[in-house]
Amino acid sequence: MSIKEKIKEVAFLKKLLKRLYLKIRSDKFVKLSQREKTDAKLVVFESFQGRSYSCSPKAIYEYMQKAPEFADYRYVWVFRDIKSHGSFAENTSLVKFDSDKAYRAYARAGTWIVNSRLRDFIFPRADQRYIQCWHGTPFKKIGCDIEAAGNATSTVDEIRREYTKEAEKITAMISQSPFCTQKLISAFNLDRLGKENIILETGYPRNDELFNYSGEKVERIKESFN
């Protein structure tokens, strides 16, 4: 067997194992989703697939913590490394990414607030809302706009299917500009799905802080560079 053939065999086995793992996880989530009841006042947050406490999910979470109309809400943050994120408010729980507790949170929460694609098998029920914040302006081609060969783990067709499947479950998607809106519609196949109207061209919540600053904060930032 040549080196190229060996590499192809290893890649095939990895893909097979990944599909098996995802099938097991998918079956578990389906059972949880069928068993759990939706809690309208529970919100789950995830940023960059659990890698950080950041971006628009963080901005929305911190706004909701201060807003009196959400005083009786409870929250769940999904992290890959829970220990590195310190303490949160009493009304907030931390769960590990890709864990049973994380899937249970998604199965129960009335609202999901995320800035990157979720696992394919995590799908909301009719009484759940999935708010996709995304994480920037797609200046490079992503999703269904990709034309060149795929990456090391996915073909072009697989990437397009993944983005289309993601779009099918999104309730609302945030955009920061008309340019961004058109790119997101195209990348997520929203026009073909008849879902262009899910785009909310409000600007990214993470940018609100740039317009709501104080002189004291400006000076503090300047001092940090000295």
Where are these regions (language model features)?
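A nucleotide-sugar donor-handling region in carbohydrate enzymes
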Residues: 12-26, 140-143, 148-149, 154-226
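Hydrophobic/aromatic residues located in beta-strands of well-ordered beta-sheets
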Residues: 75-76, 130, 173, 199
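N-terminal pre-catalytic "stem/leader" segment of glycosyltransferase-like enzymes
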Residues: 2-101
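Helix N-cap/beta->alpha junction signal
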Residues: 79-81, 116, 176-179
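Glycine-rich nucleotide phosphate-binding loop and flanking beta-alpha elements
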Residues: 51, 113, 119-120, 180-182
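Extended catalytic core of nucleotide-activated donor transferases of GT-like folds
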Residues: 58-62, 67, 91-155, 161
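Structured loop/turn residues at beta-strand edges in well-structured enzyme cores
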Residues: 38, 107, 125, 168, ...
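Receiver (REC) domain switch-region micro-motif
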Residues: 43, 112, 173
